[in-house]
Amino acid sequence: YTLLYTKHTELKLGLFALERMVQIMEMTQAGMVYADRYQQVNGIRKAAPVIDYQFGSLRDDFDFGSVMLFQSEVFKKMVKTTKEDYQYAGLYDLRLKISQKKKLVHINEYLYTEIENDTRKSGEKQFDYVDPKNRRVQIEMEQACSEHLKAIGGYLEPCFQSVNFSASTFEYEASVIIPVRNRIRTIRDAVRSALNQQTSFPFNVIVIDNHSTDGTTEALRELCTDHRLVHIIPERNDLGIGGCWNTGIHHEKCGKFAIQLDSDDVYKDEHTLQIMVNAFYEQNCAMVIGTYMMTDFNMKEMAPGIIDHKEWTPENGRNNALRINGLGAPRAFYTSLLREINVPNTSYGEDYALGLCISSNYQIGRIYDVVYLCRRWEGNSDAALAIEKVNQNNVYKDRIRTWELQRRIQVNKIKLKPQKAILQLIEEQTHSWELAKQNYQALEEYRKQMKKMSLAGKDFDMLVYTFPNPKRILSATAQTD
């Protein structure tokens, strides 16, 4: 067995901890085992449990703890299969390769104590992956993840469905969707930010007031003097943020495009809505994601500043989306499609689930200029989460990834069936038909003479690749009887 310790500080193993890890390894025949642990922070010991590894646990920052035990034979074999010379993604690549062949088993027992020096709150750690100084790291992580997806059949080639925006008619071109519960300190700012938008099209603001009790409802009623504000109090009392979204997008007054605005955030200026809607048409996409700036309650910029998700690429963004923990904000959707999918009725990860689902078929548009201000304050639901809540959230997102990855693999299998049948037919013919065999062999040689040509017309400009194939001139003497 091979034990890997990823910290540089003192490690204190529990009584018979290594023996227990070996025991579980032998019982499960896992490729790797990892365990819950204690963390010592400023001299105080606290429990730091980890979570089970799932098929879709593709985050490169998945928390295994600092102690991992590997089967040495599996470890060496997977290292030998690695062609890339990674500087940063070596361990991530190794774990993905091992997961293709063996299980990664979580021992939910506290087997060691580690010294923890990163004492930042959960709300501060969640943006590490978009820090510009980590860009080289992220490029390697994306490469490793993409290779893993190709190996397991979950990789999607950059082919997308087009969107027909004239398929349905709407009274409004756009609707700003604001779910809210008990945000009396911020709801007026959010609604006014939406109503102040200047656009070339009609829009409205749909606020789903999820039974507020702090004066939010009364504040919204005061703002309803503007006829563009639609104030909805749901009949149901079991709705999360996703359920509130479903209530809004299925409302008869919802516009063609549904644009997010959280109840404690604001748009950067009066042009955000126009910019978001324009992007749908300019990029022919079913979902648009903008760029936001982190601010304090008074809307002054604070670290980490601008979050633009420039790791996204049109070609590989939807594959890399399975690795990263978020897609950005604000998010906007083509309402007709969103009504078909519906939003998971949760208050965490519902937007991420939509992004994965939509991107599997359609292109996601991007805006890299700041259009949104995300206010961080003590009232944020994710400002400082307990480890148990962080784990709960991560389990759910990993489950979302697992479901989406399983779906993508099934779709790829269906797509490959006709191609496999064609290749099988060609293989059978080249074995039983000598002339066909000779012609295919000759074709491979002719391909080596391929040339690139540029063709330009009145309305088009394209590159054409040509190569000679004189065997096509001759009859293949095929018989049809």
What is each model feature region?
Residues 1, 235-253:
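Glycine-rich, basic loop-to-helix element that forms the pyrophosphate-binding segment
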Residues 1-12, 255-266:
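Short beta-strand-to-loop acidic/aromatic patch adjacent to the donor-nucleotide binding site
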